[in-house]
Amino acid sequence: MAAALAYRWLLCAAGIVNVLPIGGQRHTASDNPSTYNIGGVLSSSESEEHFRTTIAHLNFDQQYVPRKVTYYDKTIRMDKNPIKTVFNVCDKLIEKRVYAVVVSHGQTSGDLSPAAVSYTTGFYSIPVIGISSRDAAFSDKNIHVSFLRTVPPYYHQADVWLEMLSHFLYTKVIIIHSSDTDGRAILGRFQTTSQTYYDDVDARATVELIVEFEPKLESFTEHLIDMKTAQSRVYLVYASTEDAQVIFRDAAEYNMTGEGHVWIVTEQALHAKNTPDGALGLQLEHAHSDKGHIRDSVYVLASAIKEMISNETIAEAPKDCGDSAVNWESGKRLFQYLKSRNITGETGQVAFDDNGDRIYAGYDVINIRDHQKQHIVGKFSYDSLKAKMIMRINDSQIIWGGKQRRKPEGIMIPTHLKVLTIEEKPFVYVRRMGDDEFRCEPDERPCPLFNASDATANEFCCRGYCIDLLIELSKRINFTYDLALSPDGQFGHYILRNNTGAMTLRKEWTGLIGELVNERADMIVAPLTINPERAEYIEFSKPFKYQGITILEKKPSRSSTLVSFLQPFSNTLWILVMVSVHVVALVLYLLDRFSPFGRFKLSHSDSNEEKALNLSSAIWFAWGVLLNSGIGEGTPRSFSARVLGMVWAGFAMIIVASYTANLAAFLVLERPKTKLSGINDARLRNTMENLTCATVKGSSVDMYFRRQVELSNMYRTMESNNYVTAEQAIQDVKKGKLMAFIWDSSRLEYEASKDCELVTAGELFGRSGYGIGLQKGSPWTDAVTLAILEFHESGFMEKLDKQWIFHGHVQQNCELFEKTPNTLGLKNMAGVFILVGVGIAGGVCLIIIEVIYKKHQVKKQKRLDIARHAADKWRGTIEKRKTIRASLAMQRQYNVGLMASHAPGTISLAVDKRRYPRLGQRLGPERAWPGDAADVLRIRRPYDLTKSGQLGLGRTRPQQNPLPPRYSPGYTSDVSHLVV
């Protein structure tokens, strides 16, 4: 007994060792269950029997069932009571450990039993595969966490709608849908798919009007009134069969089901009893084939379990509904495997999206005719070669509304259009009406500001190239119009906005383009350049005028100014020449002044040595050499100064020769007509050059520069200089504030033909054309294009060119002016003659100044002479008086001396010292000093001194070496200090 127990224990241990992973080894097939129960909640006994048969056959299909794996069926009948269905699922399915459940539709419409099954099994993460439930609610994975279905939801018909619209080239539709979950889901699917998968804007369908109604309609008349005023005549209808009958009934009363109207409906609306003839509807292939969907769901489940067995371990399914703590992770992973299936089944290609909804479902395109007879005219099916869904429709088999074989246009073609334009000479001239005017001229058309509330905004008249084109176009294709001016005066450009917080930015257009994109206008007749950015959002006709981009600049001035003779040299060079003259003169003076050989004379010559060169002579010499005038005197004397003089002479020769040659080039030779050679000019490409160029902000030219990578540096430079309007830029070119204006060639050629001072530079670049702008999908596009082509062939466009753009007589006068011979005349050299006149006038002025100055000096000298004469006379009078006084004083002293000679002892010393006073010179009084008697006698002796020492009258003796007086004040002849 003990031995037997030990043997069994060894067998169990060996089995455990075999199944446990060793060292992280991969699991084996024996880790997974060998039997799998598949539950079925079906609505009929036939479905149950087919379910059992399918699983029985599946067990013999080795492609889907691995070895030692067996599937068993567990089925219950769908109950119309959802609560009872839930209990049956728990008691009869979950208790049996089902790994998945296949569920069909309820017994009645709106049955909640399939949803109850999904709630119950989803709580335990048991996958559910629906074979007939198509409500949008089952796509919500927050509620139906483990629900898949082999049929697509109703709102997936929006994908087929878009394919049909693309096939028929309908771009504007009206969507009519119910306000329930499915109705809103189909609208959201339509809009999202249209924007995401249809990159071609031309093929993208836009929703003009959305009509939402409450289910269980009684009347649809109110909505039909709005639909009738819309432009689109293509109606997409999602409604129940009952609501569709009300819609079609009221639409027939408003004559909206006949010729020109297109009705495209879903499956439910297709079965209405009064679906209009010519309507197109969709019918899901195999929609009612429960057997096919049961088989596909079983095989999809087997395919997922097989792959899961080979990749991971599958835990057993939950068994108890009462255990709320059950978390079956294998069920969640099995659901992911199911969503990744892609097999070919009885109902077509079976695959699922992230929501578990069937994709690649095929549809039949049904055409209603002959009172509710359905005819298949196309299919939407899976193409295995292209691996995608393909729409195939036989247009010839379709009978449209009103029993028409021809496809309707899909829109109501209006005959009265809102036309916008913009002021742009010569294409559109705008004139404000006077106060006394009530109507425009015959060649003008009223053009108020668009959507302006001010009454004065209506007082404008327009004429020009585009106005004549619009008048002729309206006659040719038969439409009427209201003409208006652009509200903001701009052609329009796009602004990137992100209003919804999405990752991608949205382009929002302004100006004329914005009015067209927002469908507030029908047509733009203006010089509107065709470019890719605009063509993405609006339609363009064929170009009515081909043009490009060119550069406008002011023609280099040919008019000779008074200083035209100075043009050969720049201002800087002239200044340097003037400075050089005086610098050389100064150096010559210094060299001659300090040279030891600057002054010399010949040996054995009595002549004086030569004088050195002074500064004025040096300046005269420098100017004389420069101006090639003869130098007679004042030349350098030293060798060093003469060497510098020779160098200066060579410099002067080169300067004069260069000046003469350039003077001929500036005044005689042909000058270039433009400063720039074109867009490839290095001065435009080089951002360091001080050359201002600009264009108009947000214009087609501005967009062109943004697109061109090779012009990016140039665009960054000119971006800050761009103007708001072309008119402002052209005026600045005329004034010289702007050197180059880059704009459309038509406008610039017109300006150049009107003003001979303006010229276009270089060849055209960025060639494009002017077209008429229309809304996307406008019915007038083809008609306008054909009319413009006819205008080109008939010569009407050429006539407009001659009338408005090329002013022949003005242009011819400009050409004649250019061809006149370039000879020098008084106008060219008037400045030189005026310079000579200025020199003469300057000399005359200087001589007048010298004469006036000399007269002033003479008058001043006369006053000095008079003052000097008066001073001399006064001084003579004073001297005469002093002489008389001195004589009287001597006489008195003499008398005193005689008296003293008789009594010498009685005379005081003071008297003796004053006996012989010192007399001054003859020319004036002198100060007398005691003891100067001898000097007095030697100077002036009216009396002789006898040998006896007595004075006596007699002749004076000749004076010998008279002593100078001790003090002899002098008198000068300059008495200018006495003149007041």
UniProtKB/Swiss-Prot annotation:
It is a multi-pass membrane protein. CDD domains: PBP1_iGluR_NMDA_NR1, PBP2_iGluR_NMDA_Nr1. Pfam families: ANF_receptor (PF01094), CaM_bdg_C0 (PF10562), Lig_chan (PF00060), Lig_chan-Glu_bd (PF10613). Glycine binds at P527, L528, T529, R534, S700, D744. Residues 25-570, 670-828 are extracellular. Belongs to the glutamate-gated ion channel (TC 1.A.10.1) family. This is Glutamate [NMDA] receptor subunit 1. The lineage of its organism: Eukaryota, Metazoa, Ecdysozoa, Arthropoda, Hexapoda.
